[in-house]
């Protein structure tokens, strides 16, 4: 089977490509990791790679996730975060292609004030341009054949820093840095997400709809960071507890906790607890 990964130079897309290419039953195509990087924001380029690869599955891990950048350059970030998705389905329709799309979305769409995990049917909060764009991309997908995974992830990479790497570097720098006391999330290890996608591919569980994909519980950013630092034996008191929206210029969601019961039921996968994910990441990569 041919699988096309878009966004393969990003944190998740790159690791997903490396993971899936080791399976002989899967022919993984990407839009460029090395010297030949194809700009999929150009519709002609996107059409070419889709037609050339003739995929049965497209995994869209592309996008601009920098919330501040999305606010500064709404036009360019919209082109990448929304127009690319629109173009995928226009190409599919024009050339009568038959592929399924997995679209990675964001937990920034949630902000339940009750501080309980958010369900897929809960109220959507548009706190910034990034969440507005991700919702627009989701609406396009919902009209087509696609699975939308609202997620958050962490995990060490030699190509691009993830949240845990920022935490590690911040603690060992022994300089003051902020940790947020009021932002909660339920991330998974990148490696865990890769394994889940592999399971979905081999089981051919291509199911339309929106699904929360995260750990089975969550923590505040400060709790995550302190646990991570202590398990890595780098803990110190240089961090400064702070409220996120007093520090960040662009408003962020505070409660991004994910209720993952729907995903577990539909895909028959038991998702891990966040504490176990932290322990596994340190054991394997630190």
Annotate each language-model stretch with its function:
Residues 196, 203-249, 254:
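Mid/C-terminal beta-alpha module of Rossmann-like enzyme folds, strongest
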Residues 40-80:
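NAD(P)H-binding glycine-rich loop region in Rossmannoid oxidoreductase-like domains
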Residues 139-185, 190-199:
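NAD(P)-dependent short-chain dehydrogenase/reductase
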């Amino acid at each position: 089977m041919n699988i096309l990964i878009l966004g393969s130079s990003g944190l998740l897309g790159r690791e997903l490509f490396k993971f899936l290419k080791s399976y002989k039953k899967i022919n993984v195509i990407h839009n460029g990791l090395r010297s030949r990087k194809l700009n999929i924001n150009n519709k002609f380029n996107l059409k070419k790679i889709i037609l050339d690869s003739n995929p049965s599955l497209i995994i869209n891990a592309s996008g601009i996730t920098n919330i501040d950048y999305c606010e500064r350059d709404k036009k360019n970030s919209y082109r990448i975060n929304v127009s690319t998705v629109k173009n995928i389905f226009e190409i599919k329709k024009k050339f009568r292609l038959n592929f399924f799309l997995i679209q990675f979305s964001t937990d920034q769409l949630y902000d339940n004030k009750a501080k309980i995990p958010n369900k897929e049917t809960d109220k959507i909060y548009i706190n910034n341009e990034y969440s507005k764009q991700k919702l627009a991309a989701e609406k396009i997908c919902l009209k087509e054949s696609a699975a939308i995974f609202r997620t958050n992830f962490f995990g060490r990479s030699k190509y691009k820093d993830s949240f845990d790497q920022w935490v590690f570097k911040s603690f060992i720098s022994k300089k003051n840095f902020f940790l947020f006391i009021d932002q909660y999330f339920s991330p998974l290890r990148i490696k865990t997400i890769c394994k889940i996608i592999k399971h979905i591919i081999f089981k051919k569980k291509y199911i339309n709809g929106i699904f929360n994909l995260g750990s089975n519980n969550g923590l505040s950013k400060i709790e995550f960071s302190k646990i991570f630092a202590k398990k890595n034996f780098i803990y110190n008191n240089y961090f400064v507890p702070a409220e996120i929206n007093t520090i960040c210029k662009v408003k962020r969601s505070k409660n991004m906790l994910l209720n993952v019961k729907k995903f577990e039921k539909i895909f028959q996968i038991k998702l891990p607890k966040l504490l176990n994910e932290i322990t596994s990441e340190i054991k394997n990569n630190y």
